[in-house]
Curated annotation (Swiss-Prot):
HAMAP family: UPF0262 (MF_00678). Belongs to the UPF0262 family. This is UPF0262 protein R00612. Coiled coil: none annotated. InterPro entries: UCP032146. Signal peptide: none annotated. It comes from Rhizobium meliloti (strain 1021).
Length: 158
């Protein structure tokens, strides 16, 4: 689904002070940002239209969404507790480690089984993110999936 040209993200920046991670994690970050900017639905509730820039960071163990317009006007800052994400992210890390090992040496059926589990946990995290942003930011599921990937990248780095 192509989103309205104004109800979308045009730029996403992750907190660079946390540093870099493994090549696999950095690849996940790059792909998520590329896919997110290609197609997304992102509408801060109560704001007439973007496109928007998102600065995503971790501050004092909280997830911070700083949103501005493409022109730089601040729109909103939303701060979310990480508590609802901790178990999901931990499970996701563990299954991703298994997945990265499997793609190097496992059979296709083993890789597929691990990937199905990975996708299921990723979907759970994406839905949790949508629920936590409900009433603050309207997004579609694909946008939530890509944003959840970036939340995981911040965890990995932090």
């Amino acid at each position: 689904m192509k989103a309205d040209r104004n109800l979308r993200l045009c730029d996403v920046v992750l907190d660079e002070t946390i540093g870099r991670s493994t090549p696999d994690v950095e690849h996940e970050r790059a792909v998520a940002i590329f896919d997110l900017l290609e197609e997304n639905l992102f509408e801060p509730v109560g704001h007439p239209g973007g496109p928007y820039r998102l600065n995503l960071s971790l501050v004092d163990a909280k997830l911070v969404f700083r949103i501005s317009t493409d022109g730089g006007t601040e729109v909103a800052t939303h701060i979310l507790s990480l508590t609802p994400f901790r178990r999901i992210v931990k499970d996701y890390f563990m299954i991703c480690e298994s997945y990265y090992q499997a793609i190097r040496s496992a059979t296709p059926s083993q890789i597929e089984a691990i990937d199905m589990g990975r996708r299921g946990i990723h979907n759970e995290g994406s839905q949790t993110l949508m629920d936590r942003l409900s009433g603050k930011i309207r997004l579609d599921f694909d946008t939530a999936r890509r944003l959840f990937t970036l939340v995981c990248v911040l965890y990995w780095r932090g």
